[in-house]
Amino acid sequence: VADLAKMPHLLIAGATGSGKSVCMNALITSLIYKLHPLHIRFIVIDPKMLELSVYSAIPHMGRPVVTSPKRAEQVLSDIVVEMEKRYRRLAESGVRNIEDYNKRQQEETKLPYIVVCVDELADLMMSATSNKVEMLITRLAQMARAVGIHLVLATQRPSVDVITGLIKANFPARIAFQVASKVDSRTIIDANGAEKLLGAGDMLFLSTGQPEPTRIHGAFLSSEETDRIVTFIRDQGLQMMALEGISQAEGENTETEVDLGDPLFREACEVVIRHKQGSVSLLQRRLGIGYQRAARLIDKLEHAGVVSPFDGSKAREVIVDQAHVDAMFSGSAGEPADRSS
C-alpha cells in the first residue's frame, strides 16, 4: 500500500480500457473510507463528464465536479491561491508542513488535505490555454505537498504533448497501464514494459525513489459498488461547506460574478489603474481588507476585463483606463463598502 502524501503526486496513464478510471475510483474510495470530510476534500476535474461525476453527492467534495476545460483552468488558479494562503498561515504559525500545523490546532481549525483529481489531462492540454494549465499544474506539483495539496492526473494519451517533460519531472510517482507501444511506455515510466501488460488493471507502478517499476494488479471496483458507497455516505446527512476561495458554479457568466453595486469593487478598479498593476497584496494594503476579500475582488476585476488573467507570480496587467471604468459604472448607485474579510 502506498501513501499519497508521501508520493506526493501521482500520474496515471494507459490506453482506453486498461483500467485508469477504475484505478482512480479505487483511490478515491480508499481515501473516503478512511478519512472524514473534515480531514480531506476532493476537487474533481472530469472533462469526460461520466467517470467521476458520481461523487458529486458526497460531503468530501470541495466543489461540484468540473467538466469544462475553461472552468478547470480557473479552479486550478484558485487552488494555487489557496496554496499560497496556506503557506502564509504556516509561516505565521512557525511550522514547516501541514502535519505540524494541524497538531497545534483545535479540530475545527485544522486544515483539510486537498486531493485534485483530473481524469483526462489530454483535454486540458489540448485546450487553447494549455500553456497556462501546464504552468499551474507544475507550480502545484512543485510546492503544494507541504501544505497538504496533492495531484492525481490520469490520461489515455501518453504522448509528449500531454505528458510534457515539465509535468513528468514533477511527478516521480507514476502508474503505467497497458499501452500500444514501447514509446508510450517510456513516455510514462522511462522504461519499456507497459506495452506487454495484459490490461484490465495490470499495471507497472513507479514509486518515489524507486529505480525500477513494480508490476502489480489493481483492485476492481464496479459501478454498483461505487453507487452503494456514495449512497451510504450521502444518507448520513452530513453537510459540509464548500472550500472557500474555490470557484463553485458551472456555467457562470460575467454579469452574475461582477457586482457593480459593490462600492469596494469600484475602489479596487481605481487602485489597480492608479498603480498600473493588480495583485491581492496591493488591494489588501490600499483598501485595508483581508486576504479572502482581496482575492475575490481580483477575480471580479479579471471577469470584468479590468486586469489580465492569472500568470504565476507576476502582477496582473491592467488592460483598461479610467474612462472605461467610469463608463462601466455610469448609473450605478453607491453604498457603504463592506470591508469584511
Language-model segments: residues:
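Conserved beta-strand position immediately N-terminal to the Walker
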Residues: 10
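The conserved Walker
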Residues: 16-17, 155
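Residues at the beta-strand->loop junction immediately N-terminal to the Walker
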Residues: 13
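Conserved lysine of the Walker
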Residues: 20
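P-loop NTPase motor-domain active sites and their immediate coupling elements
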Residues: 1-7, 23, 29-30, 37-44, ...
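P-loop NTPase motor core
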Residues: 54-79
